[in-house]
Regions:
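Ribosome-associated RNA-binding proteins
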Residues: 1-210
Length: 210
């Protein structure tokens, strides 16, 4: 059963969840306008439905020492988005891969954010939301990432992990620069996501659509 097919059986646990299920809130934008926190992944399923897509960008094995000995678990990193202004990144850990994927997917939905898009390149100026409106920096662990507006047709000049996240966010043109241990996929992904989150926070919600 797909997430959007299970919404009828969903029993919300939060006030926001009930507002969404009863149709009193009809979009993610309304939620962010009211500065409300998403605490149930089903909220995202209900509002984005079949628009929501996801992709696994990293699977790794991690070990933890306990009194019972060494425990090996899967660590999965997943990106979700509608490729039109909303993206989320999540991490899940479990001894079974399927459970780790499900946890990462739920975490990504809880972390979903609106993406500030625009045309900030002086070489373009088309006013279409194909890039970002200004340069922004993100950081995670030892990794620093800088995203810069690029003219239409440039494409995503970034590492493979960044390309996936940017594509799911609905960005098609960008210049990027990074330093640190970018081979560590989870840190690189979180740094890119941090940059997009900072880009959104840089302006007020009332400025959306300008």
């Amino acid at each position: 059963m797909q997430p959007y097919e299970a919404i009828e059986e969903w029993k919300p646990r939060t006030r926001l969840g009930w507002l969404v299920k009863e149709g009193k809130i009809g979009s993610l934008k309304e939620i962010f306008d009211m500065n409300m926190r998403i605490k149930e992944p089903e909220i995202v399923d209900a509002l984005l439905g079949r628009e929501l897509q996801h992709e696994i960008i990293d699977i790794n094995m991690v070990q933890k020492m306990t009194d019972a000995g060494r425990i090996t678990r899967f660590r999965v990193v997943v990106v979700v988005g509608n490729q039109n202004g909303f993206v989320g990144l999540g991490v899940g850990k479990a001894r079974q891969l399927r459970i780790a994927v499900d946890k990462a997917l739920a975490d990504a939905k809880l972390n979903i954010i609106p993406v500030r898009r625009g045309c900030g390149s002086f070489e373009c100026g088309c006013s279409e939301p194909h890039s970002i409106p200004y340069q922004v920096r993100g950081k995670a662990g030892s990794v620093d990432v800088v995203l810069k507006p690029a003219p239409k047709g440039t494409g995503l000049v970034a590492g493979d992990t960044a390309k996936v996240i940017l594509r799911y966010a609905g960005i098609s043109d960008i210049w990027s620069w990074s330093r640190g241990k970018t081979s560590t996929t989870i840190n690189f992904a979180q740094a890119v996501f941090d940059a997009l989150r900072r880009a959104y926070r840089f302006v007020s919600v009332s400025e959306w659509g300008r």
